[in-house]
Amino acid sequence: MSIRSSSPAQSRTSSLVQRHPLACFFVLTYLAAWCLWAPLVLLRGTLPAAVAFILVLLGGWVPSTVAIVLVAIMHGRRGVRRLLGRLVKWRVGLRWYAVVLILPLLVPLGLGLSILFGGPAPTVDSSIIAVLVGFVFSIFPGSAVGEELGWRGFALPHLQDSRSALAAALILGPIWGSWHFPLFMIGSESRPLILFPAFMLSAIALSVLLTWIYNSTAGSLLLVVLLHATANLPITVLLGPLAIDAVQPYWIFTALLIITAAVVVGFTGPANLSRTQRKQTSEDIRPVPNPVPAT
């Protein structure tokens, strides 16, 4: 007979994670990602493009990596399997796929209104194939999967344990948005620092919409990832080429996003941000206990 034992250090780590899962997640996610992105800020313009790309990519995967590690500590392999299983939860109703495709149209709508009021029009050189490749990349290995196992898969359910879905979304939004700050400090023409205030507000509004999708689909991370990716794509393709001139259309897009989020809150109510499902809590990401055999 063998007895599994853990070292005192492992026991202390497990106890800390069990008692403070959110604090552990946020601290580790910020610390690891910002350490990876620090060279981009400190050595901006001098790093080889390939190195910079890899650092951005690795940092983008930190939230999901941290979530998997914490779930493994808290719930073991079965917990990790349950978390990953939400990435393939696709039977949620066609209307939610339609929502995921329609919401990103706010970006070209915002750009169109900006042009109508005298703003510049972008020169889009991307072919359809390039756009499709960019979309697939933004899902995996891009930031959508790399982020959402953490932000919506781990942090959101824990935030919803003791507060309404709206409150959880409004807390998570600024934390999620601020986490991107170093990427606005690296001097990229497609992500100028002047856009950061609008980006923060759009992150908060998008956090509400992603929470709505997540709760309404009973925790489908697949739909969350798809919305994250489809929202990023038109911003990159349409607003990225404008560089500093993207300020006006980005603010208009942000205003439209806030209005949409407000309509969703009014329609669903703040408690669950869903008319048909309850909010997802940390209980929903724990593995189901094995049935006790009858004696």
Regions found by a protein language model. Give the residues of each.
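Alpha-helical transmembrane segments in multipass membrane proteins, preferentially the mid-helix core
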Residues: 204-216
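Membrane-interface helix/loop boundary segments of multi-pass membrane proteins
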Residues: 146-173, 215-220
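C-terminal membrane module of polytopic membrane proteins
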Residues: 217-295
